[in-house]
């Protein structure tokens, strides 16, 4: 009864109390959506938005030549089908990419000499090949040269204006010097900064500084670029001062009598210089030397006072806001920005000037910094200012007004050279309240003026103005893969543009076609370089599905245009309050990259501007709704946000009077009616890896970090088991990672075998349509991953089962039943055992080796290439000189090892011979050789052999041959096998379509009367007229004649139509498979000089061994120290031994108590399984089994429906369901919303108050002194395997200069004997061993040759010579101009000459190359 108890579904009991409101968004959507937006491949050309690739083309084209007589315009682009599919690219080492074709138009103009008007002379339009562009696979990766790569998203500073100060470090007084910076997406930076004298300076592109007013004046000399809000600004001193300062009007009433206009806004905080009286009542409102308070100002306004009397002293030192001119003579009496002195004031009074304006500067709230800057700056006109800027940017260039203005305009106001991007414009609009449209991406006059105003306000200490926090996520944005590629494409196109311009001017444009102008090489080169060697294009971490998902969700602050490890300080790396729900505070690497590489939180997504958003539920009047919206860090600032676990009743109303909330990064308590938003889920705070750790809330942060990082290093095991104690998101990770096979449509499973699943899909069609309703899923079998782990998919469905779209139908690596399964559930005991678990060592049971519990399969790929060398062609063959038959026993006639052969180090995988010849052969010799065959002495054995440390089984071999080269037997056999596989798929597909079509025909014909006789090809009657068609009669007629059965009405036409449609579908299927088979038969594209390439894959089974690293999910890692027989391990009262013994001292100091809680809950879950197993074995009645099962499934989502199902199950099906639980009841305890102690006790059942067990010593049978914590923990085997690290060398390659052995396993190097090791040997007095280490075993060339000979002859003498490193030292000293000479004693000379006589050559010269093997 496959329909009820389905195999591909796991039921988990969830302990979470908080209902799931929003689904977790697709985990790799950040990659896929970004790249889709970049390519816009599925959007018709005319509907594409100007972003991504389209945007780049639009911004670079049209390209005009230097004389503007012709232009090359962009029309549209489209992508063609990729040449190879994903699998073929993997196998052949190709890049998965599609050719891009661009339609361009070349327009040639005629120019009228007199009027300068242009008219079109000629238009040519053409489609041009524009290179290849890598495509993203289904899983968000790229395949470059056959390897999977991921482009990591970059976190960088958002464009816009930023304000900061130097934290008092620049000047000894500790004074804060404020600065501002306008950062564009691309273009020149503008920096404003104050010095310690409060003068404001500007720097352009970090060059020498100028007074800021020079830039402000220069703005007057260029037109405003604002589209919506242009301003009149001509850069005069008066305009600049009035923009930044308020003015006061001073009236001269007579000698020594002055008044100023009463301006309530400016009076606040000022002191009165005399008693101020109410004009009507004459009472004193403000006493002399007292401040104007708010109440006093209100009284003055109520009294309708228009002006205030002031003392002459108050007017002195005021600054004039405008030129004061004598109207009779036209003489300037007081210049703008001039200080008012006693003499000037008297002069004004004498000349009869009644009033003048001064700047309001009170040195408290308004400082004279900008006025002082204007005084410093000696420039008076915009033209001079622009020239001055030119001199600073191009020192040594004589400026002309035209070139200077051009440079200045191009710097900031030309969209080709300067781009704020939409984000930059959005930020400027937001900061300064400007309403400029987002498509205006250059700076405007107002932007620059407002930046200066804000900076001056900061300096003045204006309230509500503060410096920016650059680590706030509103000031950092994500550049995902699409945007990074867009920037690369732009670089390539700009390079190409230069070449096109040159070609347009060099050649006759009339005769050219667009393709003559365009060379796409620069673009392709840039893209290739980006994918091949950019810091952000990384080799995918493919250890297990979680590591893949995490790698695609990673955010890096490093990379081009980002930070560097050395420069990044503590603040950038630290967790910021805006990371909440956006960036995970836990998952980041340990080491130099800590905090610079982060991971997106589970629910986070990136919006169109590149800011990270997180979802919140809306709260209305204290009631939480189910409406969910996403907010970026800036948008959430004003809101009061409740935690996801705030208590609410069934209607969603907060139950308490006070709710714990967050506002602007601080924790506050608020009333329910003040709350605006609420978190969606408790695990929105952490990333995917961290949310897989149960009881994360009980772990110390450092250990949680290790735990989430180590899960990514877990090796996929041979027998996978999902965790008994999970967190409920295991299924989501497995599904989104793309390693499982997921059903594309609803349907019924037709057939299943280990390598493929055939599904007949439910396709709603009309009576006569024949649709392709077959989905064939070819599973991946034993494929090598980037990290040499094994990728293998196995079906989890049976024929006849119904599947829904999105169901998992096959498990991938490290998944079980569609859930992530990185490790194994094992019974652990926390106790010391004979010191074998000292310092985090792990003691484990031999059962793991016997039952392959922690066994993993690793696949190594070996490649053998036959090249065409100068001396002749290399050949892959079985006929190898000087190799016995025993070594060739597993090679086939082509010289390639057979599949299934067991190999060990030194075995031949592919036989290859290379011609060796001292001389090039003459034509005659070549001819004689061709006639009489090769001499064996002319070739040497260069076969591919198994390297040391690898032993396993050959599972696959692939042969690639050049086009036009005869394929060998092995290649033909492989090709035939592939072809047979394709034909099987084709036949299955046609069969299912045929069955479906004839099913429809049968339905139409049943019950109809035959209106005409039907005969077969030989004339035999099949049906006679008048027969009534039923099932039995129809089955006697072969199906190919059904279309010819004559019946009344329009049924016959319908039947014919079905037959026609079926034939059409059949041809389509054949065409598709024909293409695939054609590709198989074609030769392969190989690198130049390569004739044939063979790849051999060897599978290595690695059992758990002493020295392997293991870990739990809470950062509790250790190394296996001993494997104990089961009978020696501590065992429980019922005789079951534990699997692993861990040290209890590893818990308290590490503070990862989560592991203990997991152990208890795992024990409870396991016990449920054991009890059910016992009930089955003891044949309990179906009623008791039903009761037990229903109790087990309490608290599962939809448990009422489950209970009903259990009641309805027939008695014989109950044990089946119970056996599914025999390993234990799977539970989920979500992060920050997990199981409580009382719930765990309830699951454990009665009588286990202490949650500890009595254990017995396996060797003596006696109980241990104290009770021991025993339970089930999920343990992982990490990718640090001792078999891959162990390495030994006897003879191997030596370094060329020092003649010492190379280092490292990859180079087959030796062990380094360092300074401390020498001391240790000296301390033990092991003089001869030490002498041997430092000479004959290392770099004494003569000595080691002698040693070799002595060993061969069987003598045991040691004669050490002079180490080569001594010669290196002498050469080093000589290079420092020290004359060092090595003098030889007569005895030594005699010994050397004797040795030279024996060896037949001079000694002491370094012989051989870096990889010279010292073999005789």
From Swiss-Prot:
One of its GO terms (biological process) is DNA-templated transcription. It holds the Pfam family RNA_pol_Rpb2_6. Keywords: DNA-directed RNA polymerase, Nucleotidyltransferase, Transcription, Transferase. It is an enzyme of class 2 (transferase). InterPro entries: DNA-dir_RNA_pol_bsu_ext_1_sf, DNA-dir_RNA_pol_bsu_external_1, DNA-dir_RNA_pol_su2, DNA-dir_RNAP_su2_dom, DNA-dir_RNAP_su2_hyb_sf, RNA_pol_bsu_bac, RNA_pol_bsu_CS, RNA_pol_bsu_protrusion. It comes from the Bacteria. Residues 1388-1416 are annotated as: Disordered. GO terms for molecular function: DNA binding; DNA-directed RNA polymerase activity; ribonucleoside binding. One of its GO terms (cellular component) is DNA-directed RNA polymerase complex. It catalyses: RNA(n) + a ribonucleoside 5'-triphosphate = RNA(n+1) + diphosphate. Its EC number is 2.7.7.6. DNA-dependent RNA polymerase catalyzes the transcription of DNA into RNA using the four ribonucleoside triphosphates as substrates. The RNAP catalytic core consists of 2 alpha, 1 beta, 1 beta' and 1 omega subunit. When a sigma factor is associated with the core the holoenzyme is formed, which can initiate transcription. This is DNA-directed RNA polymerase subunit beta. It comes from Anaeromyxobacter sp. (strain Fw109-5). The gene is rpoB.
